[in-house]
């Protein structure tokens, strides 16, 4: 198994090794460095990094499809807030639920089971901040099902992303289909519009970004080796299933001081199944974050 030091070495292996002329080093090929990270890790990496100030970008497999896993919950929380902004939902509306609705990784809904229900806003916060699976399913049902989230993405100009199932089935793309998938480029664009655009009112956008900034599920992923003064707004996704392997995802808006935000979307698939998330898999996205910071001139 590849370790973290090897991944970091792979991330820099293709940096300044080619000379454009006597004494002049060519600019690093950051896409090639992503490819090197993928080769060292042994799985499949999809990544896209966008500088929202210049419009410049780089990526690897950025137009190939990857499973959302729980990264969809950021968009789900945004949809709840957008519907509230439009007056079609009351964020204080309480959705009832019972023990039968609970799934693995449902910490907030399980802790509040005795209440018999939680407000829409609290469920959206739980889905984003701690990736509560029961909360996500309750919200999807209230909004009209997974296709409602797909429709939301279409209104944002995203013709690629789609959601077809509920938790936990949405963590797999059925063979021969494009279900429950997106591409790094498409999701980066959607994330930019939600977080940095006018999809939400200023108050709702501040609420969502507050939840994102409080999210701690990705401490070993994109944000792990960023400069200490960068703010990070992100949502992770993780999938582990025998016969399918493991998935480790993270989508993020990076807010460096004194420069335009970066949007980063990373999806890594390890074909070897493990019951637990492997640090080496998360290190792939850690390397992606470090590479994005280097590219931005940090």
Question: What does each model-found stretch correspond to?
Answer:
Residues 55, 67-95, 264:
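Active-site SXXK
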Residues 46-50, 59, 75, 96, ...:
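Soluble periplasmic/extracytoplasmic beta-strand elements of cell-envelope proteins
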Residues 6-25:
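N-terminal export signals
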Residues 102-138, 146, 180:
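Conserved catalytic neighborhood of penicillin-recognizing serine enzymes
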Residues 2-9, 27-34, 142, 189-220, ...:
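Structured C-terminal helix/loop/strand segments within mature extracytoplasmic catalytic/sensor domains
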Residues 137-199:
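Mid-domain, small-residue-enriched loop/turn segments at the edges of structured enzyme/sensor domains
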Residues 88-118, 148-168:
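Active-site helix/loop module of the DD-peptidase/beta-lactamase fold
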Residues 21-67, 291:
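Beta-lactamase-like hydrolase cores
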């Amino acid at each position: 198994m590849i370790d973290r030091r090897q991944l970091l070495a792979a991330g820099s292996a293709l940096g300044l090794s080619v000379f454009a002329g006597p004494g002049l080093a060519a600019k690093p090929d950051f896409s090639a460095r992503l490819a090197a990270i993928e080769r060292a890790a042994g799985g499949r990496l999809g990544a896209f990094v966008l500088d929202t100030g210049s419009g410049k970008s780089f990526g690897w497999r950025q137009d190939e499809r990857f499973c959302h896993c729980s990264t969809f919950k950021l968009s789900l929380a945004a949809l709840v807030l957008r519907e509230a902004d439009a007056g079609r939902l009351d964020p204080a509306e309480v959705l009832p639920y019972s023990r039968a609705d609970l799934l693995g990784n449902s910490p907030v809904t399980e802790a509040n089971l005795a209440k018999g229900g939680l407000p829409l806003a609290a469920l959206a916060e739980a889905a984003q901040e701690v990736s509560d699976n029961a909360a996500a399913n309750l919200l999807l049902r209230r909004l009209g099902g997974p296709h409602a989230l797909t429709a939301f993405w279409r209104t944002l100009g995203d013709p690629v992303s789609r959601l077809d199932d509920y938790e936990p089935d949405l963590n797999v793309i059925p063979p021969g289909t494009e279900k429950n998938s997106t591409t790094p480029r498409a999701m980066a664009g959607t994330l930019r519009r939600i977080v940095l655009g006018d999809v939400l009112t200023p108050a709702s956008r501040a609420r969502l970004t507050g939840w994102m900034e409080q999210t701690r599920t990705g401490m070993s992923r994109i944000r792990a080796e960023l400069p200490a003064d960068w703010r990070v707004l992100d949502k992770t996704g993780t999938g582990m299933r025998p016969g399918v392997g493991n998935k480790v995802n993270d989508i993020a808006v990076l807010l460096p001081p004194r420069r335009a935000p970066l949007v980063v979307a990373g999806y890594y698939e390890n074909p070897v199944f493990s019951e637990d998330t492997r640090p080496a898999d998360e290190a792939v996205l850690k390397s992606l974050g470090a590479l994005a910071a280097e590219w931005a001139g940090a």
